[in-house]
């Protein structure tokens, strides 16, 4: 029997050594957040965990443990039959639950008695979460940041994608958050991660970055949709050198009509989101936008959204929060196309190399 216990810090340093990372918590807990690359083998599923918890409160711990053990044994047997039967002798799994207790302990004990070299995460997910929160500021502080600024529709995301495609280091917070970071930024069909999940995604994206090379990041606000950017990252961004991406208004409108095509295809959804802006622009102005959109005049509304709402708010935020924005290097692609962004990215990287 081989069963080893490691601290969260040790596990993080050795994650690459495990053949599988097994989360023994319920599917609901797993969905909220989990270790990178983890698979979910619930010792108790959502309903079972709720029922056992009720038994604990309404009867007593002994009866709850008996019932829980019976359910857990069946579930572990099912996982072994489905997932473990064909594993080789040298398979090395890591297992964890909420606090590294009974759920992952039972699974780990059985796997180790089979003959596998099993590692148990001491303190479980709770310890991992604490380690991630502690580690993010350290990782952020080791990196050299280049902040891509620019008004809405200037192509910041396209430029980041072009930079990444050409080998640059990029941290795309909007991609991690499944949100385009504005009142109209929700992406249909894509739910945002929980705050804990977002933190883990950011942390995991930071880990492989090379401290000797700059990292490009968009000038995000403190929140991207419903999730908050780690404070240490916000602070680092606001003190780092900036690039100011500039496009003519007509190009910005064209880009937004492409990237937000789902609004054009679902006018009522667009109108629903526009109504949120009544608080900021007034009911009369928004009513005019709604009428224009429903009449098919979308481009003029987008133009007014930029000049009357997004641009003033964005520029005020940049000047107030990003200390080096005033001295930002202005960069201008020839147009809003992907090809133009690729060309601009190439120029930027060439300039960095010289």
Sequence positions of predicted segments:
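Flexible, polar/low-complexity N-terminal or interdomain linker segments that lie immediately upstream
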Residues: 1-36, 64, 133-141, 145-149
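Catalytic cysteine-centered active loop of the rhodanese-like fold, especially the PTP/DSP P-loop
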Residues: 67-122
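Conserved NTP phosphate-binding and transfer environment spanning the P-loop NTPase/kinase superfamily
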Residues: 235-354
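Conserved nucleotide-sensing/catalytic segment adjacent to the nucleotide-binding pocket
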Residues: 165-236
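Hydrophobic/aromatic beta-strand patches that form the interior of the parallel beta-sheet core
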Residues: 22, 39, 94, 119, ...
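A short glycine-rich beta-strand->turn/loop micro-motif centered on a GG-aromatic cluster
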Residues: 94, 116-130, 172-177
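Positively charged, proline/Ser/Thr-rich regional signature most characteristic
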Residues: 15-88
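Glycine-rich phosphate-binding P-loop
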Residues: 101-103, 144-165
